[in-house]
Amino acid sequence: FISCIYLQNKALIAFGMAKKTLYIFNPEHDMALASGVTNYMAPASARQMASDLALLPMWYADAGSAVLAPSAYNADFLKTKSELLSMDVALLTEPEVADGKDRKFSPWGWDPALRKRLMTLGADQAELPSADYMNILREHSHRLQAVKLLPGLRLNEYFCGESFYLNTLAECSAFVEGREVCLLKAPLSGSGKGLNWCKGIFTTFISGWCARVAASQGGVVGEPIYNKVEDFAMEFYADGRGQVVFAGYSVFHTGG
C-alpha cells in the first residue's frame, strides 16, 4: 500500500490543454527531489539511464507532442518507429527548448533541479511550477503522508499493513529489535532505493544510516515484513487540477 500511495507522485501534470507537450524522461527525479537542491547531480548510472531511455515517453506521448532527447542516435530510431506505427511524436533537443514559448512540460517527475535546468535552457517560466510548488510537492512526496493515510485503507479484517514514522534513534532501535525482521525506509527515495532490511539487530551500520537519513529527511519509516504472495503497485494519474484516476497495475518480477 505504501508503494501505491507513493507512486501517485509519479503523475504527469498538465498546465493547459491547447499547448503542445514536451515530455522529459528524468529517472533521477526521486533522488533530486529528496536532495531539495537546484544544483543536484545524479549518480552516473542514473544519468546514463536518462540518456539511454530518453525516448521512453514516445510510447505514451500525445499526438503532436515532442520528446526531449539528444538527436545524434535517437532521430533515426524515432523516425523508423513513427513511420512503422504511425506515431505523431517529434524529437526536440535541448538547444531547441528556448525556440518555442507555446508549450507545456510533462516530465517523469518535477524537482527543483529540473526546473532550474529548463529555465537555463530558456523555457518559459510561466509554464514551469513555482518554487513554492516544489516545496509542497516534496512535502507530499514524503512517506510520512503514506504513514498517515495507511490506516484509512484497512477497510475490514481482510486488509493488513502498518507503517511507522520513527523520529529518534531510540525509536529506530526499539522498532528493529522488537521484530524478527523489518524494513526501514528513507522517507524520500526512489522506488526500491533508500531501504534497509533488518533482522532484529540494531547494528552500528543501521544506526549510522538512520542518523543520516533522519538528519536530512526528518525521520525514518519502519515497516514489518509480511509473508507475502505477490509484489505489485497501483498507479494513478493526476491531471494537476484535483482529478485522480486509477491508471493500472505495476507488477514486479524479481529473481527472489
Which sequence ranges carry the predicted segments?
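N-terminal-proximal low-complexity accessory segments that begin disordered
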Residues: K19, I24-F25, M31-M58
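Conserved ATP-binding module of the ATP-grasp superfamily
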Residues: N156-G161, L183, C198-N227
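Glycine-rich phosphate-binding loop of ATP-grasp-fold ATP-dependent ligases
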Residues: E162-S163, C182-I206, A233, G256
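Core catalytic machinery and nucleic-acid-binding channels of phosphodiester-processing enzymes
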Residues: D132-H142, G222-Y226, E235-A238
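Conserved N-proximal alpha/beta basic substrate-recognition cap immediately N-terminal to
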Residues: L12-F15, A46-D62, L68-A174
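Phosphate-binding core of ATP-grasp and ATP-grasp-like enzymes
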Residues: N227-G256
